[in-house]
């Protein structure tokens, strides 16, 4: 992951933060092995990811307990998770894939989760996490489906 990575955590948090790549790495606390199923009809099995649990990042910024939604974004691409989804042990911001540090051009940091997730929730090149009391506008599914129609 390159030094140009910068992730902001904002919204209903005690301490809005901006984390650089080295700071994200220092928080790494999880590994996930999960299948990935794309709506295009292909799958990858037993993908190994290492990174920071999303709930760890939320705690680091002091996310409000009554904020029920987490928006994860990369530019105009946004996925909205419920707080329960975000707090799941299997949801992380991946920094490594298959044992190798992954650079930003490959989509890192990347939101990854359990195999039952819709593929469009796997946001690549995450640049912000926003904690809110009300759900924000999610664009992930619309953008992903438009790409499939090409």
Name the predicted role of every residue range.
Residues 37-77:
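Mid-length scaffold segments of soluble, non-membrane domains
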């Amino acid at each position: 992951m390159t030094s140009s990575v910068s992730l902001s955590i904002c919204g209903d948090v005690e301490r809005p933060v901006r984390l650089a790549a080295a700071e994200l790495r220092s928080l790494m606390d999880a590994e996930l092995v999960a299948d990935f199923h794309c709506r295009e009809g292909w799958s990858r099995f037993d993908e190994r990811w290492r990174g920071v649990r999303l709930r760890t990042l939320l705690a680091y910024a002091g996310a409000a307990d009554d904020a029920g939604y987490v928006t994860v974004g990369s530019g105009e691409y946004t996925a909205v998770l419920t707080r329960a989804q975000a707090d799941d042990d299997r949801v992380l911001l991946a920094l490594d894939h298959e044992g190798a540090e992954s650079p930003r051009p490959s989509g890192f940091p990347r939101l990854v989760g359990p195999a039952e997730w819709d593929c469009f929730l796997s946001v690549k090149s995450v640049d912000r996490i926003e904690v809110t009391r009300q759900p924000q506008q999610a664009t992930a599914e619309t953008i992903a489906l438009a790409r499939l129609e090409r």
